[in-house]
Swiss-Prot record:
It comes from the Bacteria. ATP binds at residues 116-122. InterPro entries: Mur-like_cat_sf (IPR036565), Mur_ligase_C (IPR004101), Mur_ligase_C_dom_sf (IPR036615), Mur_ligase_cen (IPR013221), MurD (IPR005762). Pathway: Cell wall biogenesis; peptidoglycan biosynthesis. GO terms for biological process: cell division; cell wall organization; peptidoglycan biosynthetic process; regulation of cell shape. It holds the Pfam family MurD-like_N. It is an enzyme of class 6 (ligase). The keyword Cytoplasm applies. It is found in: Cytoplasm. This is UDP-N-acetylmuramoylalanine--D-glutamate ligase. Cell wall formation. Catalyzes the addition of glutamate to the nucleotide precursor UDP-N-acetylmuramoyl-L-alanine (UMA). Its EC number is 6.3.2.9. It catalyses: UDP-N-acetyl-alpha-D-muramoyl-L-alanine + D-glutamate + ATP = UDP-N-acetyl-alpha-D-muramoyl-L-alanyl-D-glutamate + ADP + phosphate + H(+).
Length: 457
């Protein structure tokens, strides 16, 4: 793919878009940037954009402008239904994302690509940690750490890439072919963008559409939707399950012990209770990580060592502090009901929950039922607070309170908590109504908890 002298339009000037622009510029393209946000809404990105881009358009771009470009790179946050992208498709101009662009210039074909509604970051990090014990050149990137495009020019044919990939990024691939494509689970999420579960599932399935007979598809047998994909998967299939399951290549649990069967050989790995990070969802993440590393010939002892010591990742049921016997956990990455339910189920102690945020169109019916069983009190904030409250009231749960800020939620949670209680931030919603992203929300939560430690807030 020769970029020199090409007019390339980058749509969406966030992290992924600017990373693509840097790469395009370095390879001799004339780079035009467009973002629907008004110019004054840009903060630190504005200076980067002005340095990188030959032309910039904010808010809107003239229709006739599309005739000037030979390639469009779209950021994952931009729906393909946006007018410039629809026009480009109609005119036969190629529209791809940053993942596809990076793949076309990537020297290595040792790519592990991991997607799923929940567990992506933890599993991606785990896979990276396991592989790094046996291989020198392992790069973990994508939605975690650096964008894929920022890592390829310092890589070689021997580099192993471990990518966290979202459904939005998978919408814009074309030739992207990982050695291993993994779908951890599929539950309702991003329905404001995908509209239906069928569309969402089809987007996730794209991770294995180009895998050949030398590659592997990893699927979760315990999730209804991914189980139904086993017969449709490309390449060699590796299945993981929390129960004993009969497949040629499988990672499973029997009598509380983890085993794998791969290429005709069955091995015991470890007792499931020896995994350091808590919760059934993290057991699934561990089984998936084992599945993704088997084709690389990883030793069983290496897997065991990592799973016994890996302490999890930031914003995923992250222990923050203990104050007067009250433990605070940051699960800001709980951006949908399924993730928040898994966080609630990870604890046996009484829970005081902080929930609510940006409305992605999910139902809170099932979530409310679990809250009623597991949670002493809920502090609700953000766009969805009334929606969640209505579901709680419908089933007769009245121990909730509206708050205006996260700081207020932390203070009031501490005031009503008792020795042995858990204060859990697991919003079951995205963060965009009050914060830039879930990372900022999680960091602010930790900051407020640490203020309690020092000042009593």
């Amino acid at each position: 793919m020769d970029l020199k002298g090409k007019n390339v339009l980058v749509v969406g000037l966030g992290r992924s878009g600017l990373a693509s622009a840097r790469f395009l510029k370095k390879h001799g393209a004339f780079v035009i940037g467009f973002d629907e946000k008004a110019e004054e809404q840009f903060k630190e990105e504005k200076n980067d954009a002005q340095k990188l881009l030959d032309e910039i358009y904010y808010c809107e771009i003239p229709d006739e402008f599309i005739d000037r470009v030979q390639l469009v790179i779209v950021s994952p946050g931009v729906p393909l239904s946006k007018r410039p992208l629809v026009l480009a498709h109609k005119k036969g101009i190629e529209v791809i994302g940053e993942i596809e662009l990076a793949y076309r210039f990537c020297k290595s074909k040792n790519i592990v690509a991991i997607t799923g509604t929940n567990g992506k970051t933890t599993t991606t990090t785990l896979v990276g940690e396991i592989l790094k014990k046996q291989y020198e050149d392992v790069v973990v990137c994508g939605n975690i750490g650096l964008p894929f495009i920022d890592t390829i020019e310092t890589s070689s044919e021997d580099t192993i890439f471990v990518l966290e990939i979202s459904s939005f990024q998978l919408e814009t691939i074309k030739y992207f072919k990982p050695k291993i494509g993994c779908i951890l689970n599929i539950t309702p999420d991003h329905l404001n963008r995908h509209l239906t579960m069928e569309n969402y599932t089809k987007a996730k399935m794209r991770i294995f559409e180009n895998i050949d007979e030398m590659g592997y598809t990893v699927l979760n047998y315990d999730n209804n939707i991914t189980r139904d994909l086993i017969g449709l998967a490309k390449g060699n299939v590796i299945v993981f399950s929390k129960t004993k399951t009969q497949f040629e290549n499988v990672v499973f649990v029997e009598n509380d012990v983890i085993y794998f069967t791969f290429e005709g050989k069955t091995q015991e790995v470890m007792k499931k209770d020896e995994i350091f990070i808590p919760g059934q969802h993290n057991l699934e993440n561990a089984l998936a990580a084992i599945s993704c590393t088997l084709p690389f010939g990883i030793e069983k002892d290496t897997i065991e060592q990592v799973l016994k010591t890996f302490r999890g990742v930031e914003h995923r049921i992250e222990f923050v502090a203990e104050i007067n016997g009250i433990k605070f956990y940051n699960d800001s990455k709980g951006t949908n009901t399924d993730a928040a339910e898994k966080a609630l189920n990870a604890f046996e102690n009484p829970i005081i929950l902080i929930a609510g945020g940006y409305d992605k169109g999910e139902s809170f019916e099932k979530f409310a039922s679990l809250v009623a069983k597991k949670v002493k009190k809920v502090f609700l904030l953000g766009q969805t607070k009334q929606k969640i409250a209505s579901e709680l009231e419908r089933i007769g749960y009245k121990n909730f309170e509206f708050v205006s800020t996260l700081k207020e939620a932390v203070r009031k949670s501490f005031e009503c908590a008792q020795n042995g209680d858990i204060v859990l931030l697991s919003p079951a919603c995205a963060s965009w109504d009050m914060f830039e992203n879930y990372e900022q929300r999680g960091r602010m939560f930790k900051e407020y908890v640490n203020e309690l430690l020092t000042t009593g807030m």
